[in-house]
């Protein structure tokens, strides 16, 4: 199992708009690709930065499926995101492999 983690620091001035858009538009669009098993929206509570930081963890079965997402779907979805929020909610991505569950 692969976890595709997107970490985003959201400016206070757009927080409510951002959270609504992510829950009602962006995350459902990512899941509608039918490549991901699930997603969770997580608020990072140990962060001392200004604004609020979130980590969205998307679970996907394999790196090959993630590559398919990156090639076929991500460019359009990232463009939509960038046109709305990039300067007020920058994101970075981390890809993790689940080694074991307890």
Question: For each predicted feature, which ranges?
Answer:
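A generic structural signal for alpha-helix starts
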Residues: 12-17, 64
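A short, structured loop/turn motif at beta-sheet edges
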Residues: 33, 61-64, 101
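A broad, structure-centric signal for solvent-exposed, well-ordered loop/edge residues
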Residues: 17, 37, 46-48, 67, ...
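Glycine-rich beta-strand-turn "strand-cap" elements at beta-sheet edges
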Residues: 40-49, 80-102
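Short amphipathic alpha-helical segments
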Residues: 15-40, 76-79
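Short N-terminal helix-initiation segments at or just after the protein's N-terminus
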Residues: 1-7, 35-42, 57, 78-86
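Short, well-ordered beta-strand segments in beta-rich or mixed alpha/beta enzyme
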Residues: 3-9, 42-72
């Amino acid at each position: 199992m692969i976890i595709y983690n997107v970490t985003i620091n959201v400016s206070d001035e757009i927080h409510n708009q951002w959270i609504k858009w992510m829950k009602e538009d962006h995350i459902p669009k990512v899941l509608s690709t039918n490549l991901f098993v699930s997603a969770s929206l997580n608020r990072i509570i140990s962060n001392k930065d200004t604004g609020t930081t979130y980590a969205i963890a998307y679970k996907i079965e394999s790196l090959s499926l993630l590559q398919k997402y990156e090639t076929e779907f991500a460019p359009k979805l990232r463009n939509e995101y960038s046109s709305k929020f990039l300067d007020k909610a920058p994101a970075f991505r981390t890809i993790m492999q689940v080694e074991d569950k307890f």
